[in-house]
Amino acid sequence: MTIGIVGRKTGMTRVFTDDGVSIPVTVIEVEPNRVTQVKTADTDGYSAVQITVGERRASRVTKSEAGHFAKANVEAGRSVWELRNNSQEAFEVGASLTVEAFSAGQFIDVTGTSKGKGYAGTVKRWNFGMQDATHGNSRSHRVPGSTGQCQSPGRVFKNKKMTGHMGAERVTVQNLEIVRVDAERNLLLVKGAIPGAPGGDVIVRPAVKARTNA
C-alpha cells in the first residue's frame, strides 16, 4: 500500500487474457520516486510527502532548489510533487518509491493534464446544438445564441458556458484497474485511457472510491 507515485504516460497498447480477450491498456513508466521532504502535522500543520522524479541539469536548478535537494541528500529532479499522507505509513527522506507498491488487480485514480485544444467554440467545447443549416440562417450555424436577458438582470451570469480555451486542465480519472505490474522495467499497465498526451507526468494514487471485481 502507498499514498501514491508519479509516473510518465508513454502510450497505449493492448494485452490479452488467457481466454484471448483483448484489453486496451495505458503504459505508465514509473522511475523511482525520491522522497525530498516529509511534512508532519506538528511542523507543517498537515501530513504529506514531497517527492521528485527524473533528473535535471545543474544549470537549470536554482540555488534554493539546490539547497533543498542537498539537505535531503537526493539528486535534483525535473520537478517536485506533494502527496497527502493520511495513512499511518512512515516515510524517510531519501527513500525511493517504486511500482512494487502497487499490485495487479488494484484500483487506482490517475491525475494528469489533459491535451490542450486551443480556443474552441461552444459546439466543440460544451457540446452545444447547432442552429439551422438553411432557412434564412447564413452565418450563425455554430453561434451559441443568446447569453442572457435584457434589462433584468442586465448581465451575463457567472459560469455561463461560452467560447474559450479548451483542455490543458488538471483531470482525474477514477477507478482504473491495474492489469499488470512490470517491476523489472518500472511499468504499470492500466486498463483504459488516462489524461494527457504521451510523455506527460501523471500522479497515480490508490482509488478513493475503491470498488471490487465482484
Swiss-Prot record:
Instruction: Provide an example Pfam family for this protein.
Output: Ribosomal_L3
UniProt cross-references to InterPro entries, sorted A to Z: Ribosomal_uL3, Ribosomal_uL3_bac/org-type, Ribosomal_uL3_CS, Transl_B-barrel_sf
The UniProt annotation puts the region (Disordered) at 133-155
Q: Which Gene3D superfamilies match?
A: 3.30.160.810, Translation factors
Q: Name one GO molecular function term.
A: rRNA binding
PTM notes: Methylated by PrmB.
Q: Which BP terms does GO give this entry?
A: translation
- A GO cellular component annotation in the UniProt record: cytosolic large ribosomal subunit
Q: Which residues carry this modification: N5-methylglutamine?
A: Q151
Keywords on record:
Methylation, Ribonucleoprotein, Ribosomal protein, RNA-binding, rRNA-binding
Family per UniProt? Belongs to the universal ribosomal protein uL3 family.
Its biological purpose is as follows: One of the primary rRNA binding proteins, it binds directly near the 3'-end of the 23S rRNA, where it nucleates assembly of the 50S subunit.
Subunit record text: Part of the 50S ribosomal subunit. Forms a cluster with proteins L14 and L19.
From the Swiss-Prot or TrEMBL record, give the protein name.
Answer: Large ribosomal subunit protein uL3
**Originating gene:** rplC
